[in-house]
Amino acid sequence: MRWIGKVGEEDLDPKLLMWDLHRHVDPALVPPGRTVVSFRFNDVPAKIRDWWLVMTAEEVDVCDFDPGYDVAVSVTGSLRRMVEIWRGDLGWPAAIRSGIIQLDGPERFRRAVPKWFPASQFAQVRRSAVDMTFWLAS
């Protein structure tokens, strides 16, 4: 198994990203009750810009419409940067510190976001020098 080099614009899909994020939330890390995280991708058309994850200890649902629950924390940034976080190319701390990704909500929820949404399990797959050179050159 190996990573593709550079992710092209045609490869950026918020539905795919959100589906994968929702599949990998560890329910043991979710606070008791219902926790809602909203995502806004500010670089995509309005129709696919806003997403919500509704999390409980039993399940995580992904919504492309406002489910009507109070939002615990909002995540705002570009789809490309969120994909980079998911791929492991960009870490949550660096993305947050630099302002690439903004988190809005109580501190305990802002601190939990990186734990709830870690990089993909495939982020640990070593990339070849060719893949990395291509990625770093772009």
Language model segments and positions:
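Short, flexible, solvent-exposed loop/turn segments with mixed acidic/basic and small polar residues
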Residues: 27-28, 61-64, 89-93
